[in-house]
Amino acid sequence: MLYHLLYPLAYKLSLLNVLRYPSFRIVAAGLTAMVLGLLLGPIFIERMRVLQYGSTNVREDTPDTHKKKAGTPSMGGALILASVAIATLLFADLANRFVWAALLVTLGYGAIGFTDDWLKISKKNSKGLAGKKKLVLQVLVVVVVYYACLTDWRFHVEHRFPWVFVGSYVDLHVTLPFVPSRLFNPDLGFLYLPFMVFVVIATSNAVNLTDGLDGLAIGPTVVSAMTFLALSYVAGATIAGFSLAEYLRVPYIPGAEELGVFCSAIFGAGVAFLWYNTYPASVFMGDVGSLALGGGLGMMAVLTKNEFASAILHGVFLTETVSVILQVWSFKTTGKRIFRMAPIHHHYELKGWAEPKIIVRFWIISVMLALVALLSIKLR
């Protein structure tokens, strides 16, 4: 918004020329989101406490250390989303369809998570929105955003249906990390949309499963946001006519550098939230935060053409999800459990690990995986 309002005035005030540079707006968005989160955090937490909007999502078989957390203010993800939305709308180029796609999916998944949290709080139970309904809504959000923001429609009066689908603004090819595109670069065609839906929903639900300890989900989330900031800038930026994507032999995506503003906003809002979510947490993000942030990260994987590389980057989230799948499969087929409790972070709790130790070690692993994902840019 500021880019569109103030940059045209640069001929009168040369200082405003900085708005033309994505790098400046990326930093500004991150700082804005961080300041907003830090300033509004205490107000939000106190309001949630007064309204008694506390966590009810405590399982009967949960470790004893979690039972004392019942009643901790929840739905802190709403604060994250507000900070992200404000910072993105202020500093991003709002003519960029990629920015709108990422932001709308994030907010759409936030609305789903908000509904889930509200049902849990109002009914005083941990069930919330039915799983099938949640899945249908998640699919619907991605499909609607894809056709609204990422496809080209042309108006032709001579056709029976005047609006004609022309093509997609998203490259329908996929690549593998560490594998040259000349060896693996298939065009998925009409199968790409279902694949895109799967990536976004899987990432969203994986972050949701990881959000079980204080700061456990938000830590890897901010690491992923910074990684995608770098990946999006490499994919779209040109410096004095020099393309970073061409040099590194990764897909060139014009306009992708603007996604750095969105990623920086997530980073800033996430760090601010971590200030209040670190052990022992003063507030939980709730499904409104975990589903939304996961959806946003999933969209970043799609828009920067790192769908498979995101499996490395999101290794912590993936491990948590796989642990649940294996636990359910083993119990249903053999009657035995592989882990003491799933997701796997609870397994380590029951083994006697202190909660802060689990959290910090998972953060360290997420940083290591992010570095491996970044290596995949060059090693192809």
Swiss-Prot record:
GO terms for molecular function: metal ion binding; phospho-N-acetylmuramoyl-pentapeptide-transferase activity; UDP-N-acetylmuramoyl-L-alanyl-D-glutamyl-meso-2,6-diaminopimelyl-D-alanyl-D-alanine:undecaprenyl-phosphate transferase activity. The chain crosses the membrane at residues 26-46, 75-95, 98-118, 135-155, 161-181, 183-203, 222-242, 259-279, 283-303, 311-331, 357-377. Keywords: Cell cycle, Cell division, Cell inner membrane, Cell membrane, Cell shape, Cell wall biogenesis/degradation, Magnesium, Membrane, Metal-binding, Peptidoglycan synthesis, Transferase, Transmembrane, Transmembrane helix. The keyword Transmembrane applies. It is a multi-pass membrane protein. Pathway: Cell wall biogenesis; peptidoglycan biosynthesis. It is found in: Cell inner membrane. Its cofactor is Mg(2+). The keyword tRNA processing does not apply. GO terms for biological process: cell division; cell wall organization; peptidoglycan biosynthetic process; regulation of cell shape. It is an enzyme of class 2 (transferase). It holds the Pfam family Glycos_transf_4. PANTHER family: PHOSPHO-N-ACETYLMURAMOYL-PENTAPEPTIDE-TRANSFERASE, PHOSPHO-N-ACETYLMURAMOYL-PENTAPEPTIDE-TRANSFERASE HOMOLOG. Catalyzes the initial step of the lipid cycle reactions in the biosynthesis of the cell wall peptidoglycan: transfers peptidoglycan precursor phospho-MurNAc-pentapeptide from UDP-MurNAc-pentapeptide onto the lipid carrier undecaprenyl phosphate, yielding undecaprenyl-pyrophosphoryl-MurNAc-pentapeptide, known as lipid I. This is Phospho-N-acetylmuramoyl-pentapeptide-transferase. The gene is mraY.
